[in-house]
Design a protein with these regions (language model features):
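Metallo-beta-lactamase
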Residues: 102-164, 293-332
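Hard-cation-handling environments
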Residues: 230-371, 445
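Gly/Ser/Thr-rich loops at beta-strand to alpha-helix junctions
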Residues: 13, 66-68, 164-165, 249-256, ...
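Acidic/glycine-enriched edge-of-secondary-structure segments
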Residues: 33-37, 58, 179-185, 189-191, ...
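Pre-active-site segment of Zn-dependent metallo-hydrolases
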Residues: 12-17, 24-83, 87-137, 188-199, ...
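Core dinuclear metal-dependent hydrolase active-site scaffold
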Residues: 1-55, 134-197, 324-329, 335, ...
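Active-site neighborhood of phospho(di)ester-bond hydrolases with catalytic His/Asp-centered motifs
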Residues: 31-33, 57-66, 73, 85-88, ...
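Cap/insert and terminal regions of metallo-dependent hydrolase folds
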Residues: 94, 169, 191-278, 362-367, ...
C-alpha cells in the first residue's frame, strides 16, 4: 500500500480548532478547518498562520458548520486553496451564513476597538467577507449515505452524526494498492434530542478511527430535565422582573431553545413574557433550518404536529441594531437569546455588559464553555470579569443546563463505539480537554481497542 499519513493540526489536546491532514491515494485531504477559540492571544497565534501551504491541499471534507470546525476555511482560501470542499447540503447552506457572519464580527470588533483606541494584534481580522463568500464557490453538497469518490482510489460517505443540522461522521475508504478504512466521528450528537435525528455510526471493521471526546468524562441530564429547568429559570426571573440572558450557539442551540420555549408556552408552563432571539445570524440560521426539513427527526411528535416550529406569539426575531440596544433599557421581564454560545463575540457581550451587574437577572449557559472563554469565566463563578475592554462586577445569578448539549456524554460515546460493530485497529482521540481525552481513551481500551493514541498539536503518524 502507498504511504498513508495523518497529521493533527487542531483539536489535539484541546477542544477547538479541528483540522486533521490526511495524505492518502496521492492526495492531501483536510478533515475540517476549524478556528481556535478561547484565550485570545494564544488563539490568534494559532489561527493567523496555517501550518502548511494551502495551495498544496487537494480537498477539504467538512463534518459540520460550527466555527471551531469550519472557521479557518476562508483563511485557507485567502492563502491560495482552490480545491473542492465536500459537505452535506445542510452544512453547505449553514456555513454560507456562518462564515460570512464570522468575517463580519471580526471586522466590526476590530473597528469597535479601533474607535476606543484599544487595538491589539489579536483583534486584527483573519480574513474578509470576500474570503468567506469565496468558500461557498468551492462547496460540493454530498447527501447522507451516498458514496462519492473524492479521488480515483478515495471514496467518501457521510453518515448523520446527530450533532447539529447537517452534521456528519465521515467514512473514508482508500483502495490504492490495498484497502484502508478511516472513520472520522466529527462531533457526535445525543440520542433523543429534538429536531435532528439520532447519531448513525458507521459499522464494520475500521483501520483508523478519529473520535471526539468533549464530554467523555461527564454525564448529561436528560432533555426532559433540561426543559423542566429552563421553565423554572423563566419563572424565577419573571417573578423578580429580571432578564434571562442565554448565550447560545446560533446554529442548533438557538433553535432547540425556541423549540422548547414553544412547547412550554403552548403547555402553559412558562409565564407570558417576551422572548427575543437577538442574533441576525441565528435568525438566518433558522431560515436554513426551514429549508432542510428532510433531515428533521420525524419520530418527534411535536415536529409532526406543529405547522411552524419556529414561530409563536411570544417570540420576536431581532435583526436591527437599534432594536437590540433598546432591549437593554427595556423594563420588565424578558428572555434574551443571543450569540455567541461561549460569549466570545456577538450581541450577547453587550447584553452581558448591561445586565451582568443586576441581581434580578440570570445568565443561563446551555452549552459547552471552552477553557479561557468569557463564558467559562462567568460559569466558573468569577465575581469580576473583564470583557469589551472593561471590568464588570457580576451580581447576576449564573446557572448551567447540560441537557441541551449537542455532544454525546460518557455513556452515549461508549454506546456509539459499541455500535461501530467491527474491530478497530487503532484510534486517535481528539476534541477534548485533557480529562475528557483520557476518559475517552479509557473507554476505547475497555471496548477492546488496543492501539489508542491521544495526539498532540502537530503530531504526525504513518498509518
Amino acid at each position: 500500500m502507498s504511504s498513508l499519513r495523518l497529521t493533527f493540526w487542531g483539536a489535539a489536546g484541546q477542544v477547538t480548532g479541528s483540522m486533521h491532514l490526511l495524505e492518502a491515494a496521492g492526495a492531501r485531504i483536510l478533515l475540517d478547518g476549524g478556528l481556535f477559540q478561547g484565550h485570545r492571544a494564544e488563539s490568534h497565534r494559532l489561527n493567523v498562520q496555517l501550518p502548511f501551504d494551502a495551495r498544496r491541499i487537494d480537498a477539504v471534507v467538512l463534518s459540520h458548520a460550527h466555527i471551531d470546525h469550519s472557521g479557518r476555511l476562508p483563511l485557507l482560501v485567502k492563502e491560495g486553496f482552490h480545491g473542492p470542499i465536500y459537505a452535506t447540503p445542510a452544512t453547505r447552506d449553514l456555513s454560507a451564513v456562518m462564515l460570512a457572519d464570522a468575517a463580519n464580527i471580526q471586522e466590526k470588533d476590530h473597528e469597535y476597538l479601533e474607535r476606543k483606541g484599544r487595538v491589539a494584534p489579536e483583534s486584527e481580522p483573519l480574513y474578509s467577507l470576500r474570503d468567506a463568500i469565496a468558500v461557498q464557490d468551492l462547496m460540493v453538497g454530498v447527501p447522507y449515505r451516498r458514496v462519492f469518490h473524492v479521488r480515483k482510489h478515495l471514496a467518501l460517505d457521510f453518515l448523520d452524526a446527530g450533532h447539529i443540522l447537517g452534521s456528519a461522521s465521515v467514512d473514508l475508504r482508500v483502495s490504492e494498492n490495498g484497502n484502508h478504512r478511516l472513520v472520522y466521528s466529527g462531533d457526535i450528537g445525543r440520542s433523543g434530542l429534538p429536531i435532528v435525528r439520532d447519531p448513525e455510526p458507521p459499522t464494520g471493521p475500521i483501520d483508523t478511527l478519529i473520535v471526539e471526546s468533549t464530554y467523555a468524562n461527564r454525564q448529561h441530564e436528560s432533555f426532559d430535565q433540561a426543559e423542566t429547568r429552563l421553565a423554572e429559570a423563566v419563572r424565577r426571573v419573571a417573578s423578580r422582573g429580571g432578564k434571562l440572558l442565554i448565550p447560545a450557539f446560533a446554529v442548533g442551540r438557538a433553535q432547540e431553545l425556541i423549540y422548547s420555549l414553544h412547547r412550554l408556552s403552548r403547555a402553559g408552563q412558562i409565564p407570558q413574557i417576551p422572548i427575543y432571539l437577538d442574533s441576525p445570524l441565528a435568525v438566518d440560521i433558522t431560515t436554513v433550518f426551514r429549508m432542510h426539513p428532510e433531515v428533521f427527526d420525524r419520530a418527534e411528535r411535536f415536529i409532526v404536529t406543529t405547522n411552524e416550529l419556529f414561530d409563536f406569539p411570544l417570540l420576536h426575531y431581532v435583526r436591527d441594531v437599534s432594536e437590540s440596544k433598546a432591549l437593554n433599557s427595556r423594563n420588565g421581564p424578558a428572555v434574551i437569546i443571543a450569540a455567541s454560545g461561549m460569549a466570545e463575540s456577538g450581541r450577547i457581550l453587550h447584553h452581558l455588559a448591561h445586565g451582568i451587574g443586576d441581581h434580578r437577572n440570570l445568565v443561563l449557559f446551555v452549552g459547552f464553555q471552552a477553557e479561557h472563554t468569557l463564558g467559562r469565566r462567568i460559569e466558573s463563578g468569577q465575581e469580576r470579569v473583564r470583557f469589551l475592554g472593561q471590568e464588570h462586577e457580576r451580581r447576576a445569578e449564573v446557572e448551567s443546563i447540560t441537557g441541551y448539549s449537542a455532544h454525546a456524554d460518557r455513556d452515549e460515546l461508549r454506546a456509539w463505539v459499541r455500535r461501530l460493530g467491527g474491530p478497530i485497529r487503532r484510534a486517535f482521540v481528539v476534541h477534548g480537554e485533557p480529562p475528557a481525552l483520557e476518559a475517552m481513551a479509557a473507554i476505547l481500551r475497555e471496548e477492546g481497542v488496543r492501539d489508542v493514541r491521544v495526539p498532540s498539536h502537530g503530531e504526525s503518524f504513518e498509518l
